[in-house]
């Protein structure tokens, strides 16, 4: 493959893979259940998730946003959730999604409270260690989840409004200003919740090489005529802002658009 990056999804090293598909009944009592869905697919999937979860099943949600774990926990119980996030900068070309493996952070996971090196954390580390998956366990998983949430709100949404590539934040002071205002609102809410994202600044800033024309997931959804995850991004932030008495005018404007 002469491409500087490798394909993710239906194209990987120019090969097509067909994943093995199980029904929830067939997957019942699996040791590990990874939830990787678009936000609008989560609620319809909850009955299937519940059916697949057994007494000792660990559930990891790699979804965007900051509330998927809470939604899943209401269905299966808090004890099954191991908080996690995936950080990978990819862009679509033809039928494939491409990324740079050497700069991809991958999956980050951990317990919300001590012991942070729990038996299940060690088990996931051992499992992923036998694969090519990039991963890291952390004791600051809540901050990591919110750090990605911030990236999505600040980088995904403004470019989606105008239909511009990610280079718009570098080329336009106005786009950068919108991104900064969305960021300020999110950080104010995070601070009110006791979430200090500075704890993960040094470990979550590795960036994949993305061309200025790259269109992130929200804009890709609009391009394809799909429902976006704006409700998970700005919608959730607005709700949290109202609960905490923190104004979120830029997110309200973005949601309305």
Residue ranges and their predicted role:
Residues 13-98:
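Rossmann-like NAD(P)(H) cofactor-binding subdomain of soluble oxidoreductases
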Residues 1-8, 12:
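Single conserved hydrophobic/aromatic residue that forms the stacking wall/gate
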